[in-house]
A protein has these predicted regions:
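N-terminal targeting signals for export/organelle localization
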Residues: 1-31, 168
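A generic structural signal for alpha->beta connector loops
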Residues: 27, 82, 108-109
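A short beta-strand-turn-helix
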Residues: 28-51
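Extracytoplasmic/periplasmic mature domains of Sec-exported, cell-envelope-associated bacterial proteins
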Residues: 33-35, 87, 107-111
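Short pre-active-site segment immediately N-terminal to redox-active cysteine/selenocysteine motifs
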Residues: 47-50, 55-58, 127
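Thiol/disulfide oxidoreductase modules built on the thioredoxin-like
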Residues: 48, 100-107, 113-165
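Structural microenvironment flanking redox-active thiols in thiol-disulfide oxidoreductases
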Residues: 63-105, 115-121
Length: 168
């Protein structure tokens, strides 16, 4: 048992497996960031994969990953497959979130405001940023803890998106 713990500990914070992988997203409905669409579990059951990024304006690693998320949101290959990127602002204020997205670009098709962190808890989020890949049927396919990067996306998310959309 101690050996298993040490192996898991050595994998770092980005490896904590989620008990929700392979299960439907929790039921939720979040109010919208002003000027955007709100977000609910129904929005994640569109028949196409959705990338859900939990972030906050006060999170340093969220600012680190932000330029890559903006780049990802403009990827013509993902757009052709109908993949959307949506955000959940965790325990943040509307004006701070708008300021962050205004300064760095807005990669999100929709942003839900999780003011009390309840939806984040329901998703098993324990530290932001965290990013989930949701299948078109609303089933959680993958989770990444920490800043999203081209390497992580290519290794962890891209193959699952290809499989979910029947392409390469």
């Amino acid at each position: 048992m101690a050996a298993v713990f040490m192996v898991m500990l050595g994998r770092g914070k980005t490896f904590l497996p989620s008990a929700l992988i392979g299960k439907p997203v929790p039921t939720f409905s979040l109010p919208a960031l002003s000027g955007k669409a709100g977000l609910s579990d129904a929005d994640l059951k569109t028949g196409k994969p959705t990338i859900v990024n939990f972030f906050a304006s006060w999170c340093p690693d969220c600012h680190v990953e932000h330029p890559y998320l903006v780049q990802l949101s403009k990827d013509p290959g993902l757009a052709a497959k109908g993949v959307r990127l949506v955000g959940v602002a965790q325990k943040d204020k509307d004006e701070n979130t708008r300021r962050m997205l205004g300064a760095g670009g807005d990669p999100y098709a929709a942003v839900g405001m999780d003011a009390n962190g309840r939806v984040s808890i329901d998703f098993g989020v324990y530290g932001i940023p965290e990013t989930f890949l949701i299948g078109g049927d609303g089933v959680i396919l993958a989770k990444h803890v920490g800043a999203m990067s081209p390497t992580v996306f290519a290794q962890k998310f891209a193959p699952l998106i290809a499989k979910a959309t029947g392409g390469s």
